[in-house]
Design a protein with these regions (language model features):
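The C-terminal output helix
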Residues: 117-128
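Acidic, metal-coordinating helix/loop segments flanking the phosphotransfer/catalytic sites
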Residues: 33-51
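Acidic catalytic/metal-coordinating carboxylates
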Residues: 35-36, 62-66
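Two-component/phosphorelay signaling modules centered on CheY-like receiver
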Residues: 14-32
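C-terminal output helix
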Residues: 89, 107-117
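Alpha4 helix (beta4-alpha4-beta5 surface) of REC/receiver domains from two-component response regulators
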Residues: 65, 86-101
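Receiver (REC) domain active-site loop signature in two-component systems and cognate sites
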Residues: 58
Length: 128
């Protein structure tokens, strides 16, 4: 198992979670997957997360709401949001919320990895 920085993946689609986890681990990152935002928030691993990748559309709490909740709780984690249903309103909300990247599914593996590296730099600079 990779020993690199921990990336949390929150998506209600199991295939997306598994594929993203495999990609990140092959690039040297550690990854933890969660089907719901609440599962991440209850996890003991939350304090170790260096980057969050979350789906915009999930039941109960969206990826953007999760990001905003973490920021409001003084647990700001550099966040990458992904969606299969892009629209200008949610993209503007994501930018205003200072997410690292807003990815439209399907996206290239290199695009996601570039966003993760950017998030890691932001995490290191922020001293989290």
């Amino acid at each position: 198992m990779p020993k690199g920085p921990l990336v949390a993946i929150v998506d209600d689609d199991e295939s997306i979670r598994d594929t993203t986890k495999d990609l990140l681990e092959s690039a040297g990152f550690s990854a933890a997957v969660f089907a719901r935002a609440a599962s991440l928030l209850k996890s003991r691993r939350l304090s170790r997360v260096s980057c969050l990748i979350a789906d915009m559309r999930m039941p109960k709490m969206t990826g953007l709401e999760l990001h905003q909740h973490l920021v409001a709780s003084n647990r700001g984690i550099p966040t990458i949001l992904m969606t299969a249903y892009p629209n200008e309103r949610t993209q503007a909300q994501a930018i205003k919320a200072d997410v690292v990247c807003y990815l439209i599914k399907p996206f290239a593996a290199d695009e996601l990895l570039a966003c993760v590296r950017c998030a890691m730099q932001r995490h290191d600079v922020g001293g989290e």
